[in-house]
A protein has these predicted regions:
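Conserved ABC ATPase signature
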Residues: 140-144, 148
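ABC ATPase NBD Q-loop/coupling interface
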Residues: 66-81
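A short, flexible loop at the N-terminus of ABC-type nucleotide-binding domains that lies
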Residues: 1-4, 9-23, 55-60, 76-78
Length: 184
């Protein structure tokens, strides 16, 4: 499903080792869960940005090596196509919200795929039930707690049903109960 071969990346105008990846080899099979851990600045976020196409597209730098997704060269995929295959939740969910209402935010990605309204409604209902967040439906996003915003961001990605879900610090804003299993 995901294959990284001798993948290296360094940010443009960066002479520091921080934010650089060198010689990463990784093979992730369908259905497999991989957790990357390491000290701050070791490249975890950079790797997530490569997986979802933000590096080098929006974060310029030098990218070498190979990255394939489902046997296709992900480095040659248009960003919009990669975006339908790789769903991302960032460290700070506020940085990825485009709507002001929770329901609108959860369905936004599905509208852009695009999916038919009945399919979107079914996925919305399913994800909210699985994640036990029905109480957050049809609410304004900005007054929500950081943890509730994190759950909305995760629900939005899950509702799109991408082949790969990349979570960067997924439990950072969640309490211990919600962090145990935000996807039910």
């Amino acid at each position: 499903m995901i294959e990284l071969k001798n993948l290296s990346f360094s940010y443009e105008n960066s002479s520091e080792a921080k934010g650089q990846l060198r010689g990463i080899d990784l093979h992730v099979k369908k259905g497999e869960l991989v957790i990357l851990s390491g000290r701050s600045g070791c490249g975890k976020t950079t790797l997530t940005r490569i997986l979802n196409g933000l590096c080098p597209g929006f974060y310029p730098g030098k990218l070498e090596g190979g990255y394939s997704l489902d046997g296709e060269d992900a480095l040659k995929m248009p960003i919009h196509r990669l975006g339908t295959m790789v769903g991302s939740v960032f460290q700070d969910p506020r940085s990825q919200f485009f709507a002001t209402n929770t329901t609108d935010e959860i369905v936004l990605g599905m509208e852009n795929i695009p999916l038919e309204r009945p399919v979107m409604q079914e996925r919305l209902n399913t994800v909210c039930k699985q994640m036990n967040i029905e109480r957050l439906i049809d609410r304004r996003i900005f007054p929500l707690s950081s943890g509730e915003k994190q759950l909305i961001a995760i629900a939005s990605v899950c509702a799109m049903e991408p082949k790969v879900i990349v979570l960067d610090e997924p439990s950072a804003n969640l309490d211990s109960e919600a962090a145990r299993c935000p996807i039910g």
